[in-house]
């Protein structure tokens, strides 16, 4: 869902300088539980795509356990790991480059986007995933991580 801004009641503090979301932007936001319920509803039957999945899924795992009493349970694709595998594998095209999202976008000739903006990061990640899929012979099962059920 585009434009969903959680509001847990806490001030954003210095993190506003990174993600650009200010306290006044969150006035009409939803609670964490409602935001996570919407996320869960949108993920059913789908694969999540992240650029550094361990970081994102750890955050989601903690938030979901706290707010919903369940953990992260969806398959995911990590474009960072996939891009790095292409760097260290037999693919000379990516050899030794930085692997952060902007570097991956630049490597594949994609235009720059605003970093640390949730929607722009999601679109950037999806575009990199589409390019990696087009350039790879890997099957979904080879690049998709299945969740560990705890």
Segment roles from a protein language model:
Residues 1-67, 71-73, 95-112, 116:
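Conserved non-catalytic scaffold segment of RNase H-like nuclease domains
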Residues 121:
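Conserved catalytic/binding loops enriched for acidic/polar residues
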Residues 60-62, 86-89:
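Short, well-ordered secondary-structure micro-motifs
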Residues 55, 81, 124:
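Short, glycine/acidic-enriched loop or turn micro-motifs at the edges of active sites
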Residues 71-85:
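Conserved beta-strand -> loop -> alpha-helix junction used to position metal-binding or nucleic-acid-contacting
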Residues 88, 107, 126-150:
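Acidic two-metal-ion nuclease catalytic site recognized across multiple nuclease folds
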């Amino acid at each position: 869902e585009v434009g969903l801004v959680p509001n847990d009641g806490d001030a954003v503090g210095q993190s506003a300088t990174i993600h650009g979301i200010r306290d006044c932007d969150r006035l009409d936001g939803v609670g964490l539980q409602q935001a996570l319920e919407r996320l869960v509803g949108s993920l059913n039957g789908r694969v999540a795509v992240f650029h550094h999945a361990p970081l994102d899924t750890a955050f989601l795992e903690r938030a979901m356990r706290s707010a919903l009493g369940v953990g992260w349970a969806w398959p995911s694709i990590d474009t960072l790991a996939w891009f790095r595998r292409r760097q260290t594998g037999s693919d000379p095209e990516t050899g030794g480059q930085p692997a952060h999202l902007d570097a991956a976008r630049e490597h594949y000739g994609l235009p720059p986007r605003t970093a640390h903006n949730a929607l722009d990061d999601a679109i950037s990640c999806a575009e990199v995933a589409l390019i990696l899929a087009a350039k790879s012979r890997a099957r979904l099962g080879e690049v998709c991580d299945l969740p560990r059920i705890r």
